[in-house]
Amino acid sequence: MADKKGSSSEKLLYCSFCGKSQHEVKKLIAGPSVFICDECIDLCNEIIRDEATASEKDAAAAARSDLPTPHEIRESLDQYVIGQEQAKKILAVAVYNHYKRLKHLGKKDDVELSKSNILLIGPTGSGKTLLAQTLARLLNVPFVIADATTLTEAGYVGEDVENIIQKLLQNCNYEVEKAQRGIVYIDEIDKISRKSDNPSITRDVSGEGVQQALLKLIEGTMASVPPQGGRKHPNQDFLQVDTTNILFICGGAFDGLEKVIMQRSDKTGIGFAAQVKSKEERDVSEVLPQTEPEDLIKFGLIPELIGRLPVVATLAKLDEAALMQILVEPKNALVKQYQKLLAMEGVELEIRPGALSAIARKAIRRKTGARGLRSILEQSLMDVMYDLPNYKGVQKVVIDENTINGDAPPLLMYEEQQPKVAGSN
């Protein structure tokens, strides 16, 4: 019992937990057949606070362990993307900070962390799209690629910018929560630049108009998307997707941007400190890293959009050595893919170093970068892949420089027989 008889007729009350009487404590709170004093309440609150702090620390540690560090992100990118070291470092830090920020959301704090979307600038075939794809695969988040050239303002013929979010939803089976933490890669962003750096008087539905529409999406808005796809109509219930926490990566070749940068640097470089290098001597890969917001405005992007893409990474033009590495080194290297295809026929594929060099040189001449490597190799192997299922006893196919240049067909090596040229009887 929490009450005891004293010497007088007065009934003394005691704390059911520590046993102190009502005279020894400041306050005694009554419950059904029990009492608790203010000291025991303070002690309970202290225990709860300590346990809550410990669980918060454990949760934060678990959240950090789930998220790869910038070094781990960079290492994963290295497995698929050759070169572009500075761009990979910039992307690794930006993506790490973005998802760290998402884990911080919901906590009461004076400092509000804003989103840092990314702009990738680099020539065709330098790895912009592959970098974005690899990041999404590593982080296991929904990912979509959109082509800026197909977009128009709402109400005009073409794709509405909100179609991008619809595709993102489709890629995660219409799970809105997942979509709101996804990555959107908008390619060819340079192709929707306005025609001059002055605000347009006439309507530009596929240039400045699209930039304005994208601006709302990128900075964060509630996008209305028809459920399970389909066209919008007035009497329809829409899915509401908040784009505030979606990471937007915009990419483009920005052909001619180097001229804008050189014009600016030539003006600021007059005098004894001016660089002596001529415009012809300055490589595009040297110039693009000097990109400033004013250059992008001059090129035709609106200032508001540039402001929403604070992280800028430039990718260098791939040289012959880098293209040769791309052919053989990444996890999904092109040579490995074709070796796997021929291995399914029980045939070994050997591509000699001279052939790799010839493929790289051909891609450079075509100005297609890494993107053009597959078509060159496919063209060289086309006849072999067509005839191989009908051949018997072929052990190895050899591709050399002459095959790539179109001077000779691939060499077929038969079991315990002399080499034979493909297509000969």
Swiss-Prot record:
BP GO terms, sorted: cell division; proteolysis involved in protein catabolic process
Alphabetized GO MF terms: ATP binding; ATP hydrolysis activity; ATP-dependent protein folding chaperone; protein dimerization activity; unfolded protein binding; zinc ion binding
Domain ClpX-type ZB: 3-56
One Pfam assignment: AAA_2
HAMAP family: ClpX (MF_00175)
NCBIfam families in alphabetical order: clpX, PRK05342.1
Family, similarity comment: Belongs to the ClpX chaperone family.
Name of this chain's protein: ATP-dependent Clp protease ATP-binding subunit ClpX
Organism listed in the record: Cupriavidus taiwanensis (strain DSM 17343 / BCRC 17206 / CCUG 44338 / CIP 107171 / LMG 19424 / R1) (Ralstonia taiwanensis (strain LMG 19424))
Lineage, broadest ranks: Bacteria, Pseudomonadati, Pseudomonadota, Betaproteobacteria, Burkholderiales
Gene name of the record: clpX
